[in-house]
Amino acid sequence: MPYTALILAGGQASRMGGVDKGLVELAGQPLIARTLQALAAQSQPPQRILISANRHLDEYAAYGHAVLPDTLPDYPGPLAGLLAGMQAAPDATLLMLPCDALVLPVDFAARLLAALPGQQVVSASDPAQWHPSLLALQPGLAAALAAYLASGGRSIRGWLATLQHQSLHVAQKLPNLNTLAAVHQLEQQWPAD
């Protein structure tokens, strides 16, 4: 199944002291570059990649993919980035992932997409936790998401609860780098390039 990947790099990164998370380096490369490498290594790579970002747009654009700022004011969260992606690719099946999704099984996209028929959304979970921001979505959900955001909804979990949704278990632990300390800890284990 062909798909468009949407990388979320538009957050405020408040738990990282406000630095632009996608540009934080891990072993000499920004997280966005590592995530793009993880996508390129997929057994089923995307046809197109979009990057949701609200700062340093030129730095993200240098990676050669369309950069989409939020269309809603006041940084309303990752769902605003998702809405911008849906509006930019209205007929595409989307694979949404945060800019710290740099360690993915090579069949990650293929497995999520294979589970999508009969569902509106399929998200991922690993042995430690559910990852609602790692998900595949059917096209045609932009109006439902816009209505949820207009009603004041901001939570990915809350929006997923309104949809036909399934969570797919992944045996490999997926990174969740919400602090600079977590990035540094992963860097200690990172193999040399």
Question: Residue locations for each model-derived region?
Answer:
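Nucleotide and nucleotide-moiety/phosphate-recognizing core
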Residues: 1-175, 180-183, 190-193
